Amino acid sequence: MENNETSVDAKSIKNLETQTIHGSKSMDSGKYLDNSYKMDYPEMGLCIIINNKNFHKNTGMSSRSGTDVNAANLGETFMNLKYEVRNKNDLTREEIMELMYNVSKEDHSKRSSFICVILSHGDEGVIYGTNGPIELKKLTSFFRGDYCRSLTGKPKLFIIQACRGTELDSGIETDSGVDYDMACQKIPVEADFLYAYSTAPGYYSWRNSEEGSWFIQSLCAMLKEYAHKLEFMHILTRVNRKVATEFESYSLDATFHAKKQIPCIVSMLTKELYFYH
């Protein structure tokens, strides 16, 4: 294994419930049942990739080496899934807000879903524009059901590659080998969101300077292998396992050497999500 030093996506070094849903599609007819998102609109949807690599000097944040590899890999992966990919590089917090607002005001009525990937520095609840932090909730709120009507009842995925704190995970040895019939149905405005975080709350998120982040590497690999076979939550579970078992940090600083990472999925999806139909 090459000794490429591993970095973290933080500003500087200085009660979730889950549920299991069974069944999804009719294997005989291929028709969607009520527990599976309708993904056969004319378009799969937009995939916005915000790739922040270089930051203003007054922020004190370092350049995120390896992130361009992630952005290219993500673009290829989601284009192969028939998404319209829009790449945005080195955006300030104001530019990110403007971008998200404008995208939320587009007509998504012919689109099956929406994806936003953010590659940046971060902390718990915030991600960084090139000139400073912004609350993630402010960005995602533009796509709530009461603000973005054309995405109501459709899956909205936010994939976040960023630190969520400064805790380190040393690991432990183990012995063990839309279509809602909306005419008369009311749904929560926060429904149908999914947040795929690169790391658990409070922890660093690791990134290899040449190969990109562990999480994005694993996500793209699992999507390429399973997007036409498995439901999305099952894919993300495989991503979790791959990151947890196949990666360990390498650093010349003993404090940051041989550390582990586990991604975190927060789902408000109300149906199963398949990228095929």
Curated annotation (Swiss-Prot):
Keywords: Acetylation, Apoptosis, Cytoplasm, Hydrolase, Phosphoprotein, Protease, S-nitrosylation, Thiol protease, Ubl conjugation, Zymogen. Inhibited by BIRC6; following inhibition of BIRC6-caspase binding by DIABLO/SMAC, BIRC6 is subjected to caspase cleavage, leading to an increase in active caspases. Involved in the activation cascade of caspases responsible for apoptosis execution. At the onset of apoptosis, it proteolytically cleaves poly(ADP-ribose) polymerase PARP1 at a '216-Asp-|-Gly-217' bond. Cleaves and activates sterol regulatory element binding proteins (SREBPs) between the basic helix-loop-helix leucine zipper domain and the membrane attachment domain. Cleaves and activates caspase-6, -7 and -9 (CASP6, CASP7 and CASP9, respectively). Cleaves and inactivates interleukin-18 (IL18). Triggers cell adhesion in sympathetic neurons through RET cleavage. PANTHER family: CASPASE, CASPASE-3. Its EC number is 3.4.22.56. One of its GO terms (cellular component) is cytoplasm. The modification N6-acetyllysine is found at residue 11. This is Caspase-3. The modification Phosphoserine is found at residue 26. It comes from Oryctolagus cuniculus. Its main location: cytoplasm. Residues 1-9, 10-28 form a propeptide. It is found in: Cytoplasm. The active site is at residues 121, 163. The keyword Transmembrane does not apply. It catalyses: Strict requirement for an Asp residue at positions P1 and P4. It has a preferred cleavage sequence of Asp-Xaa-Xaa-Asp-|- with a hydrophobic amino-acid residue at P2 and a hydrophilic amino-acid residue at P3, although Val or Ala are also accepted at this position.
